[in-house]
Amino acid sequence: MALSGMVTALTVSANPEISPLLSLLEGMSIGLAAGSIIGVLIAYFNILPIIATLGLMNILRGMTYLVSKGKWVSAYQMSTGFKNLSTGTTLGINNLIIFAVIIYIFYSYFINQTKTGRYIYAVGSSPETAELIGIKRRRIILLVYSLMGLLAGLAGVLWVSKFASAQGDTAVGYEMNVIAATVLGGVSVSGGRGRVTGIILGSILFGILANALPLINISPFWQQFIQGIVILAAIISNVLLQRRNERAALKKRAI
């Protein structure tokens, strides 16, 4: 997010006349490239996903500081058209809501109604079994990480557009927020289970929690503590539920 947002902001500041759509495509391309690299590392070099993602995250964060030379890109350096990507409206509806609805519809259909979507669930549940039945496991893994990189690039551009500021530490610490939202939304930490609708509901729930704590004058230090407890409880519940389902499935097979 930080790199795609920063590079796009630098491009916009140097070329104010550039189309906002091209700016969006630039950021998404950067995200797609980053996601593809992670996918290749995991699928073809068998690097653990958490190592590949966190490692490249730090590399890209460093690249963000390098390309920006440690400086910010501020609102006055950005064109009105670019800032309107997030803050503008279409038919009276905020553009961010429109982006969210389009993404939700596309990915809900893709993951639930297409053969590739079913393959993704299969690989998430058991990569080895999926490969035994003819699914190209490596291609599916590469596809998933590429698509997630594409969305991260889009999010980076929209973030910079909304806040009219690009900096090297954009979205630092949001990794845990994303994990919390997905787990609260019912996504299995071991893969193979989850719905786009659940992730949205989990994001809303986590957002309500994060915004409610300051309103009741909870200390920032306690806010982090409480959010951490919620994340941990959600993960434990997720794992216990999955184990219960696995035991139930084994009993059915035995019968």
Question: What do these predicted ranges mean?
Answer:
Residues 57, 61-62, 99-109, 145-155, ...:
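Hydrophobic core segments of alpha-helical transmembrane domains in multi-pass membrane transport
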Residues 45, 49-114, 140-143, 162-171, ...:
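Transmembrane helix-bundle core of multi-pass membrane transporters
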Residues 35, 145, 152, 162-228:
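Transmembrane alpha-helical segments in multi-pass inner-membrane proteins
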